[in-house]
Regions:
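Acidic donor-binding loop of glycosyltransferase active sites
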Residues: 142-155, 168
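Conserved donor-binding/catalytic core segment of Leloir-type glycosyltransferases
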Residues: 68, 72-75, 80-104, 110
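A charged, aromatic-enriched C-terminal amphipathic alpha-helix characteristic of glycosyltransferases
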Residues: 212-243
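Membrane-proximal helix-turn-helix segments that form the acceptor-binding/catalytic region
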Residues: 12-42
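Short alpha-helical segment that forms part of, or immediately flanks, the ligand-binding pocket
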Residues: 138, 160-165, 179-180
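Short hydrophobic beta-strand element within catalytic cores of glycosyltransferases
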Residues: 169-176
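Helix-loop-beta element that forms the nucleotide-linked donor phosphate-binding surface
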Residues: 33-38, 42-44, 49-69
Length: 247
């Protein structure tokens, strides 16, 4: 599955159909192919990008994760030392961009979360914000325990990675293939969900049922970003790749 398909079924939406036409059959696709063929090296920052380019450009492709300034990403709490209070509800954060809600799967994730909130109002708090300035968005996000993000992704992207660096637990894309590409075998901090409302609901309910896990997942989320996404490590990987292609 992806932003554009579920198995062999294309996700027909107005903007999807336009992007497919432009990038597969139109001038943007032709330009992208020309650049890929002409350049000396290609960096893929996500599993999705890597699997798209590798069949045709494996000889010039290098996977380098997205960068996060982990050092300047303060933790929401030192959950390695503090247990999750059993009487406290779990606070879930959802950032809504109305124009991209269906594309990113926010509509489905929010419906699943609202179902759980209606059933267990004393155990679930939902913070849903729409089109906030970035500083306000960050403040709202950092008041929560869990971020819901990118239903159709195999991999956490920048919004999720920033949240993970600060100790939030992410519900979204965390398929085994993305961990394998990183060489990550010992931790699984992301609550991986399929693009299905019932699957999202079941995963959220399980997290609330076992909220004592949140401190460990929070700790692993920070560790994940430190290991694989630290901006200085990523910058050095770019330099090394550039040097290897230059020689």
């Amino acid at each position: 599955y992806s932003d554009f398909n579920l198995g062999t079924k294309v996700r027909h939406r107005e903007d999807n159909d336009i992007w497919i036409a432009e990038w597969l059959n139109g001038s943007k696709g032709e330009l992208n192919t020309w650049v890929a063929e002409d350049c000396d090296g290609i960096v893929s920052g996500l599993y999705e990008y890597d699997v798209a380019y590798r069949p045709e450009f494996a000889d010039k492709l290098r996977f380098i994760p997205f960068p996060i300034d982990v050092k300047h990403a303060p933790l929401i709490a030192d959950f390695a030392k503090v247990a999750f209070p059993p009487e406290r509800p779990v606070r879930f954060f959802v950032g809504v961009q109305r124009s991209r809600s269906s594309y990113k799967g926010t509509d489905i994730m929010l419906r699943a979360l609202r179902r759980l909130e209606a059933e267990r109002p004393d155990e679930v708090q939902v913070v849903a914000v729409e089109n906030l300035p970035f500083d306000e968005y960050k403040r709202a996000m950092l008041s929560c325990d869990v971020l819901l993000d990118q239903l159709y992704s195999y991999t956490p992207a920048m919004n999720a990675l920033q949240a993970m660096a600060q100790g939030l637990v992410v519900v979204g894309g965390g398929e085994p293939e993305s961990y394998d590409l990183l060489g990550c075998a010992d931790i699984r901090p992301i609550i991986n969900v399929l693009p299905d409302e019932n699957d999202v609901y079941e995963k959220l309910r399980d997290l609330v049922d076992h909220k004592a896990r949140i401190p460990q997942l929070s700790h692993e989320s920070r560790l994940y970003t430190e290991r694989y996404h630290d901006h200085l490590k990523v910058a050095q990987a770019y330099v090394d790749f550039w040097q290897s292609r230059k020689n």
